[in-house]
Every structure is written in structure tokens, then in C-alpha cells.
């Protein structure tokens, strides 16, 4: 008889839940709920389990916020809870709450070739560190290493490192944004809101007044090629994405590959392919040759957060991935 576990991927707006076959890792019965419609994450879990008439003992839910102890307070939502209390209330034997990019990193060993698009470099080196990052509402970062037949995710808040400009144009962006918001992290330019910041800074650098545009507006105008400011912003976004990925590669020697997740890049895939992304990735001066062969992959799997939550839980329960 198939034994299932609950897996989840929770962001600031939606909670996506599914079942994971503990033996195979297969994800099924995925459903998305609006976080605004429920008073707590526990309430969403109860609704899901009732709707699917399934009893589970184990669960792993990825959440887009730092996980530093038993108490979890979501960054972009009012939900806050004790992991131990939620586990007890649900009657689970095992419940893990992990960072969303911990889950994405743990999905990488489970991905197939059709889930990936490669951008330059050669073949990944088995046993070497892996980096994963992705722009969405924010900028998530994690690393992954393989030790003693186990995959170990190294989460953190790498999206909040300093934005490090490496051209006159990027330095201008930093100067304008710093005057507005003070500390300028990488996330301030590599995210949905970050794309807006890039557009606004480009327009303001020419002593003009920027329009009140959303990330979607900027992307659409850039792709339609009817707004030079939007096209510059999107082009710069791609280059800075490359620079940041190259920084991750240098920091950990990620010859196992650098992976891009998140919902933004797939929206302008053809533009991204033709952009200065790979040039930015390899623009490392004396260490250009060091990163030249490191492959970069875009993850195009529909639910890497759910897949990775399942992988994390299965490994915790003793399965070898």
C-alpha cells in the first residue's frame, strides 16, 4: 500500500500543497490555496487533508522566510506559528518546516534533463558544490553539497548581500537607489520590485519622471520594444543576474552547476537567451577562466518547491536520493 506524506510550498500570497509518495518521491494531487482566505497555515493543511480524504503522518512544508527555530513568522504574510504545536495539533509523527530555497536546492538531484535549460559552460562535475538562486518577490539563494550519500542544503539570506556594481551604468543605479532607500542589497535590483527599481533609476538618471509601472508592464514594454527605458532595465537585470550567479560560483566553487529558479526569468526566456547574462556571469577579471566552464541551468519544472520538500523529507526518513 502506498504511503503518502504532505508536502507544501508557501509564499506570501499562495500556499501550494500536495502528496508525496514516500517510496518513489512522486508528487500528486497538488492544489493551490489563497493565503488570504485562511487564518493560519494549519487551517489550510486541514482543509487540504479533508478534501483529499487522506491520512498522513509526515510532512514537510517550504516557506519563503528564514527558519531559525521553532517559531516561524512569515515575512510577507501575517501567519506565525510554532512548528512543534502545529505538529501536535495535526497529529503528525514528523513535521519539518524549511526555507523555500532549501526545498528548491533539494529538488535539483531529482530533476530530469527536460526540466532544465542550459546557458553556457560545460558538464557539471559530480560531487562538487551546487548553487541555486532565483528572483521572484525577493531573491532566494542556497547551496547544495553531497556528503556521505546525503544531500546537504546550505540555506541563507544571500539575496541581501550588497549590490556590487561593476560598470558606470550600474554605479549610477546604486547611487540613485542609495539616495532613496539607504542600503542597496542584490534583492533591490534582482526581483520583481528590483526590476521596477532599475527602471526608475534609469529614468531618473536622465532627469525625467518615471511612470508608475509594475514589473509586468516593464517586461511587456521591453519585449514589445516600444520603451527604451524598459528595455534597458530588462537588459541590465539580465546582466546583473549573471554577475550575481558568477559571484556564487566563485564563492563556493560550484563546479556542480549554478541553477536559476523563480518565476521571473521564464517570462522572457528568449530575451534572456540573447542577453548579456552569460557575459556578466563570466566577467570576473583574472578568474574568468575559473568560471568559464561552470554550467548554468534554468529550472523549468512546474513545482520544484514541492519536489524538493518531498526529497528533503524522504532523505530525513532514511531514503537515499
Swiss-Prot record:
It holds the Pfam family Glucokinase. One of its GO terms (biological process) is glycolytic process. It catalyses: D-glucose + ATP = D-glucose 6-phosphate + ADP + H(+). The keyword Protein biosynthesis does not apply. One of its GO terms (molecular function) is ATP binding. Keywords: ATP-binding, Cytoplasm, Glycolysis, Kinase, Nucleotide-binding, Transferase. ATP binds at residues 8-13. It is found in: Cytoplasm. InterPro entries: ATPase_NBD (IPR043129), Bacterial_glucokinase (IPR050201), Glucokinase (IPR003836). CDD domains: ASKHA_NBD_GLK. Its EC number is 2.7.1.2. Its main location: cytoplasm. One of its GO terms (cellular component) is cytosol. It is an enzyme of class 2 (transferase). Disulfide bonds: none annotated. The keyword Cell cycle does not apply. Belongs to the bacterial glucokinase family. PANTHER family: GLUCOKINASE (PTHR47690:SF1). NCBIfam families: glk, PRK00292.1-1, PRK00292.1-3. This is Glucokinase. It comes from Salmonella paratyphi C (strain RKS4594). The gene is glk.
